[in-house]
């Protein structure tokens, strides 16, 4: 009996099956961001059950991969670390400790599962993972939008203060659709080494504008246009003339990205200090308000939530979806929790 189980596990623990399970896992995450649970109450429970089955498979695959590792080789590599590598290793250790602390203090398992999934994904080639996620996202996007267009999934319409209607087309919030389109453009361009023909760039532009008119997602429009300009400059060889500038931005991004959580917190608190203490007619206050307007009132919104709820070193157990649709709040005015965390959900 035990031998049969081992044989069965060996048959299913293959790279092809592993990527298929990753695709199923990613698909359940996408479904969680749709209005499926609005129409079918048990959908969220079924997706959660499927994810736990995927986690079991993840564990089996990780254990198999760990057994095949040459630990002595890794020990030798660690001995030859330079200062930069030791610094990065230290950051990784701090991050792991923080994730454990977050779990213990808030009982929030999301970061643990995210780390678990990243470890599992590292068992495969990077391009294979990208291709799997791209295919899953592309098929899911077509399926969800089609079902919504046919009336089989709820099209949640969110209205801005000025009356602008924002369609979600099957997703829980309008920005999800525009973000997925943006990511698909990035995925496809990456697969083509960012060498895109003018005709396809024109199709990109039409798609971006069309989605903007449906969702009125301004941030995604601006980011998508910046991506489009960069792809155009890469395709035409213009970026090659500015190698030093490109390298500067690459290094700046790698330095600034890990500092973003701390930096954004400092900026929000500084805005709060200016908002509460500075003269409303002063130049500093006007600059702060202008910056807040550029970020669609996010600085004030986040500072107000900090003031109302407080904050802790290792985070709080909050719902990752801030304004997303549920049966109970479709017609209600929902306040954000700490951050505009529907963007955070995309990262997960």
Please identify what each model-predicted range represents.
Residues 32-44:
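Aromatic-enriched
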